[in-house]
Amino acid sequence: MTYIVALTGGIGSGKSTVANAFANLGVPLVDADIIARQVVEPGTSALAAIASRYGENILQQDGSLNRAALRQKIFSEQQEKAWLNSLLHPLIQQETQRQLAGIDQPYALWVVPLLVENGLHHRADRVLVVDVTPDIQLARTMARDGITRQQAENILASQVSRQQRLACADDIIDNSGDPLMIAQHVASLHHRYLKLATAAQQDLHQ
């Protein structure tokens, strides 16, 4: 079984930058966001169920999911959010396991934005948190998504606190400074994870 390092961080923390740095070193990525998009592609049973519940206006003209409209439907409706999660989470989990099982590298990077929120951190061998201050999170999110400060604060408030996330971390990358430092930090962690993965394999075979 491949050693699994889960990568997480709050919105605007720069998870993609860190994930890409690992990918540049040849580490295979399994990305929960990409899988979440795949399970609701046109023609899937999940998208049909969503359209059946909310009507055809939840779809774009090309038949794909209108994510903004869906977010609006569920953002303040806990019951609808629970329904959507019960539909999608098993599908995402199934596809995640399929992808992880197909990896023959010493370790894989499992990129999960809501790792702590969904209580998934126990499914990884190691948890790496990308950390920045809330002010940086807000500024980056507003700039990237073109949203107001209030909207960005609402998203931040819907995620676990910085302290809760850090409490689950085995390793932390501070992504508030020089981007060049990220590559160095990732290279160091890569070396450590290769050692940990090798040790875990040896333990299995003893």
Curated annotation (Swiss-Prot):
Its main location: cytoplasm. It catalyses: 3'-dephospho-CoA + ATP = ADP + CoA + H(+). Keywords: ATP-binding, Coenzyme A biosynthesis, Cytoplasm, Kinase, Nucleotide-binding, Transferase. The keyword ATP-binding applies. One of its GO terms (cellular component) is cytoplasm. It is found in: Cytoplasm. CDD domains: DPCK. It comes from the Bacteria. Pathway: Cofactor biosynthesis; coenzyme A biosynthesis; CoA from (R)-pantothenate: step 5/5. GO terms for molecular function: ATP binding; dephospho-CoA kinase activity. GO terms for biological process: coenzyme A biosynthetic process. Disulfide bonds: none annotated. ATP binds at residues 12-17. InterPro entries: Depp_CoAkinase, P-loop_NTPase. Belongs to the CoaE family. PANTHER family: BIFUNCTIONAL COENZYME A SYNTHASE-RELATED, DEPHOSPHO-COA KINASE-RELATED. Catalyzes the phosphorylation of the 3'-hydroxyl group of dephosphocoenzyme A to form coenzyme A. This is Dephospho-CoA kinase. The lineage of its organism: Bacteria, Pseudomonadati, Pseudomonadota, Gammaproteobacteria, Enterobacterales. The gene is coaE.
